[in-house]
Every structure is written in C-alpha cells, then in structure tokens.
Curated annotation (Swiss-Prot):
The keyword Protein transport applies. Disulfide bonds: none annotated. CDD domains: Translocase_SecB. Keywords: Chaperone, Cytoplasm, Protein transport, Translocation, Transport. This is Protein-export protein SecB. GO terms for biological process: protein folding; protein tetramerization; protein transport.
Length: 152
C-alpha cells in the first residue's frame, strides 16, 4: 500500500496552466475564389513565430504569448495569410527564479503550441485550403539561438 503526501508546504516544483486563449486571430483569403481553383500545386509557406512574456501583477504568474504568422503563395496568387496570437497564463510554483527564463521561453510555449497549431490548421481548412500543419518547433533551440545573439 502506498501513501500520497498532500502536504503543500513541501510541494514539488511545477508549472500550472491557469488559462489558455486566443488573443487575436485574422485570416485573409484575398484571391478567392480564383485561388481555390489553383490548388493543384503545393504553395510556398512563409512562417514567422515570436514569443512575448509578460510578468503579471501576481507573484510568479506570467502570460506567455505565441505570435504566429503564415503566408501561403503560389506562382500566381497570395493564397492566404493567417495571424494568430495565442496565450497562456502560467504559475511557476516552487521554482527558483533563475529557472524562470528558460521555462517561460521553452517549456511554456511548448505546452500551448499544439493548441495554436490546431487553430491554424482548422482555420486554413475552413478557408478552403488544405489544413496548414505547422511542423513541431524546437523552442529550446530558438531560446539558445536568441541567448547567443544577445551575447554577441
């Protein structure tokens, strides 16, 4: 028989997701319906991603916002442009403040990214295109690249 320690004074460090939400969503389908007839070729996708972190007024509560923009083009048309700001509110519980930057820049975005990816796939499909399935993102590599750029 095992027992579970419910004493919160010695609670294990963890990240709590308090909320997830769409802050802003825009989809443009500027060349429809002509562009929908030209779907026999694979479009070129230009993708950009940015992460914004805001320390909320409460202690150890942060908003982590993913800003994702994708533009699809073929030889003739700009097929679509989608912009999504998707955020989560995170509480870093019993975690040393020195670890906050990497957790907020790597682990928190990785937790909410699948939801943002699904929204983009659904919206592009609803616009008449194949769903845009964004490849998984290595937030750790992005963080380390950004840190090395700041040091130079």
């Amino acid at each position: 028989m095992s027992t579970i320690n419910t004493d919160t004074s010695e609670a294990m460090p963890h990240i709590s997701v308090n909320a997830q939400y769409i802050k802003d969503l825009s989809l443009e389908n500027p060349s429809a319906p002509s562009s929908l007839a030209a779907l026999d070729q694979r479009p070129q996708i230009d993708l950009s991603l940015d992460i914004n972190i805001t320390n909320l007024s409460e202690e150890n509560f942060y908003e982590v916002e993913l800003n994702i923009e994708a533009i699809a083009r073929n030889e003739k048309y700009k097929l679509f442009q989608i912009e999504l700001k998707y955020a989560g509110v995170f509480n870093l519980i019993n975690i040393d403040s020195e670890q906050h930057p990497i957790l907020l820049s790597v682990h928190c975005p990785a937790m909410i990214f699948p939801f943002a990816r699904k929204i983009i796939a659904s919206c592009t499909q609803d616009a008449g295109f194949q769903p845009l399935m964004i490849d998984p993102i290595d937030f750790g590599a992005l963080y380390h690249k950004k840190m090395s750029e700041h040091q130079n």
